[in-house]
């Protein structure tokens, strides 16, 4: 919210009739109470009190936790809970490797959402990488951001051990391993692979 006057008074010429005045130097997002007045030699009279609220930057109350994570993409979103009284010109998501990403980055989406909840695809990511994402909305007074949310893209599983083969007979044996990380996605297949040649020699 910008700084500005907490009170003001405007004097405009003289004479009876209808008049208008431009009120300047006000603070953004502030409610003011106003009365018109007229003065003559007998004193000052006032019109009925009315109020107005100046416009401000939008309010982005939510950055959604990204879903549908893959190695290179995700789906995120946000909620614009207030337009600030002015038209939203652009909104979307912005992300990066550091906290508090801003729209000066090229890694952002541009949506047509002007209020409420929206979703947006996050693309061009690197697997197994942690990102920070914020929803944003812009009007002519500036840009506001939602909270920081972190997410990590999917990567291949981590197999931390191959078990020692046991129960060896002439035609069978028992093998196994340990999967210490699923890489951020469900493991759809697992097992033991073998050959009569050293696997490291096969390239």
Residue ranges and their predicted role:
Residues 1-203:
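Short, surface-exposed linear motifs at loops/turns and structural transition points
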């Amino acid at each position: 919210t910008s700084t500005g006057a907490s009170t003001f008074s405007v004097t405009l010429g003289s004479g009876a009739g209808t008049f208008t005045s431009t009120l300047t130097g006000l603070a953004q997002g502030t409610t003011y109470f106003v009365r018109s007045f007229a003065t003559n030699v007998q004193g000052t009279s006032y019109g009925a009190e009315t109020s107005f609220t100046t416009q401000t930057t939008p309010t982005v109350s939510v950055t959604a936790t990204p879903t549908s994570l893959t190695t290179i993409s995700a789906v995120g979103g946000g909620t614009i809970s207030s337009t600030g009284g002015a038209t939203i010109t652009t909104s979307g998501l912005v992300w990066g490797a550091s906290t508090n990403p801003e729209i000066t980055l090229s890694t952002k989406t541009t949506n047509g959402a002007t209020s409420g909840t929206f979703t947006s695809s996050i693309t061009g990511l690197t697997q197994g990488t942690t990102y920070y994402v914020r929803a944003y909305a812009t009007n002519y007074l500036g840009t506001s951001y939602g909270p920081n949310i972190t997410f990590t893209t999917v990567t291949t599983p981590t197999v931390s051990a191959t078990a020692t083969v046991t129960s060896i007979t002439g035609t069978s044996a028992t093998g196994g391993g340990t999967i210490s990380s699923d890489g951020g996605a469900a493991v759809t297949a697992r097992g033991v692979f073998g050959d009569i040649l050293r696997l490291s020699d096969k390239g």
